[in-house]
Amino acid sequence: GHSWGPKRADLANDPTYGGNTDNAFTQKMGKRQGQYYVPQRAEAGLDPWATPQAYDNAKDFFDTGITWSNSLNVAQMLDKSSYSISLGNTHQDGIISSTGMDRYNVKVSADTKLTNNWSSGFTANYITTSIDKAVTSGNGLLRTVYAAPPSYDLAGIPSHVDGNPYTQNSFRGSFDNAYWAMENNKFTEDTNRFFGNVYASYQTDFGTTNHKLNAKYMVGVDAYTTHYVDSYGYGSNTGGGRGQIENYGWTNATYNSLLTINYDWHINEDWGLNAVVGNEIIQSNRKKYYEYGTNYNFPGWNHINNATTQQTEEETWKNRTVGFFGNVSASYRNMLYLTLTGRQDYVSNMPRNNRSFFYPSISAGFILTELDALKNNIVNHAKLRVSYAEVGQAGDFLENYYSTPTYGGGFYTLTPIMYPMKGTTAYTPYYTIFDPKLKPQNTRSYEVGADVNFLDNLITFSYTYSRQNVKDQIFEVPLASSTGASKLLTNGGKIHTNTHEFTLGFNPIRTKNINWDFAFNWTKIDNYVDELAPGVENISLGGYVTPQVRASAGEKFPVIYGVGFKRDANGNRLVDENGLPIAGEAQVIGKVSPDFLMGFNTTLRLWKCTISAVLDWKQGGQMYSRTTGLADYYGVSKRTENRDGTIIFDGYKTDGTKNDIAITGANAQQVYYSRLNDIDESSVYDNSFIKLREVAVNYKILQKRSIELSVNAFARNILIWAQLPDLDPEASQGNNNMAGAFEDYSMPQTASFGFGFNIKF
């Protein structure tokens, strides 16, 4: 049930559970003055009678997170060589007791000069990370924390029934009790990563001062393995009550070979020329595995071998890219600059007829203050710049009819015949069809800008405008089940982006012991979906059936799609005969892209002390907050505290007149918020906020030739002013396309306070 029941002070007089009234419980156990019966306490084997009081379930649930970071770096310069060794460790205890992280890293690098012309070196890094996570959306921990009424002692009442740790005891039975889930549901992520390179270089000036040649060959590797375990214990609401486990992960190894030859020619006092040619080979080997199991044979062992039903998948990819590139840069009197580049790529992950593509760029710069006529004491630097660039991008193409062992049936999503049957295994086509005419995606960028500094850099100004046009965008188009597949990987999308970026900086105090600078940056980014594939008006990027985040043709990218308010021809929200808002059709109910982003940063150095601060401002844009909407629906938000008040919804009646129908009665708010829960648009909020991102202080205690000692302290995310109620707008979740647009019982953002010290000797 919801928390819309009687007031806490009236619980003892509740006709069903009150200890002051005649009901089934007092008839059996006698009256308990001033108390009320709590069924969950009885299930846990406790005294079922409790005195009404308020509990701060969220405060009781969350801990204070702690992060420890330690690092040691040893470096030495020798006559013709140098080396460094770095060791690091980070340990983090999360704000939920079952979460945390441990990371260890080591880095070794060395360089040596073999002869006057030859040198060599290497860099090697190894990182191991282990993370204990908490699931949020879906059957997440916070659903029972935020939705529990303040009269319920979530932390004090055991999360399982007396004598059976695998039968939950919860206020909201459709979701796992948060404390039970911390003990029985485990989500882990373990990653081991190695990356590094080795190089050899040759350089010469040919015995002159005007010519320099540098040739460098480098080979590198970036290999990692990430293993995930998502397990719901026996008794969880996920997995039908008998548990569920998913083991999955990736092994990825990318090998890189890079050869560059750089030639620099100082032609004369006016002209300079630089040319670079090179070759790059990238080989990527990926392997994905997936194991799914459900219905544990017995409780207490969350393991795939304990599952009665198991499913496994394995996929491998191999991609190779061979690229040839070059650029030529010319300069005139350190005033005019022109650069031309080009790259030809040959890829293996495209259809055979479309495996090569060329993308060029051109850029120019003009430093006006190098002209004698413009040299002055007011404008000490002024530069104009312009550029055009193309970037090609291949897709992940496979030959059609790549098959995986599964079941056969006649329809993609229906399985009337189950295999293997009598020892015969069936196969079905891969669920994605790949367009045999797939072309590389192409992005064309245009940019103009200016940089101007005044009064010996007392004031600095920069402005950039850029436009990106993406054509032949590669994306997956959903298909009907009758096609035998679920997706088609093809070209078709066109997106363009307009970006304005403005930076203004000041450095009013510049002395030996005191320096103060501050800067503002303003950015406006507008992404537009011009078109998708023929016949496709929108594509889901994540979410539920409704609401969800979409890319929609003719709209800004992305948009929120869901059930909206029903409106009249003038856009006014309509109400029914009871004064309740009417649910309309599924439609675009929010636009995610902000109007602008603005940042402010400042640094003040006072002798040995440095103080800095960062402030961010996001204006406009919208996001969907399921947490806020359900808090209203359950009656646990501050907005629902006026239980005796009446509500007149701001809308219009179907006859076109302003709504004046009052929603009244003891359960008026419950009825009202229950209706809003059916309308996704009611949970779409303005995403504007201003946040004091960081304040930091550093003080040098000791600074001598052989040793340096400093201490530092910081505070992050300490103040926020936001339109979204209850939550930090940056507590959204999802992939990159959904980030900032969708929130469903997300982990709260945290304020962080820390200190540290550095020793150099």
Summary of predicted features, one role per range:
Residues 591-626:
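Glycine-rich, aromatic-lined ligand/substrate-binding cores of catalytic
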Residues 19, 24, 31, 43-46, ...:
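Extracytoplasmic gating/loop element in the C-terminal half of outer-membrane beta-barrel translocons
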Residues 48-52, 236-242:
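Flexible, solvent-exposed loop segments that connect beta-strands
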Residues 519, 529, 563, 584, ...:
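Conserved SET/PR-domain catalytic core that frames the SAM/AdoMet-binding pocket
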Residues 91, 581, 618-620:
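Short, surface-exposed beta-strand-loop junctions and turns on beta-sheet-rich folds
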Residues 1-48, 399-400, 406, 410, ...:
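Conserved small-residue
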Residues 1-97, 135-137, 181-190, 199-203, ...:
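Residues embedded in well-ordered regular secondary structure
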Residues 103, 107-118, 123-128, 132-149, ...:
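Extracellular/periplasmic, surface-exposed regions of secreted and cell-surface proteins
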